[in-house]
């Protein structure tokens, strides 16, 4: 049998390193309960694991408060949350058609609902965006 070469990493990483499978298998066997919802031992231990992860990620990203770190399902969900959460009525967003659908779709949704205006800046045959085009698209 030949070894598979996975090239769809924009969708997910596969295969994952064995350490990930081992950790997650152990986590679900030992801590597969809702964190922070009850006072029994497994829930408390699970919350400690989750909060420990928050602390590690906060340090990794040079943050200052692990309680401000939010987990989501995936990058697409995160982008959707951020874009819809930050957009305000009357905002103008400059982007390109090179963006992933997880960026373009929420922007399109907000534009179609009259919340924001979107300007798409062009790109050349090599996929490069001219910074001057971005400057020209900006509004006060």
Predicted regions and their residues:
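Pyridoxal 5′-phosphate
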Residues: 1-140
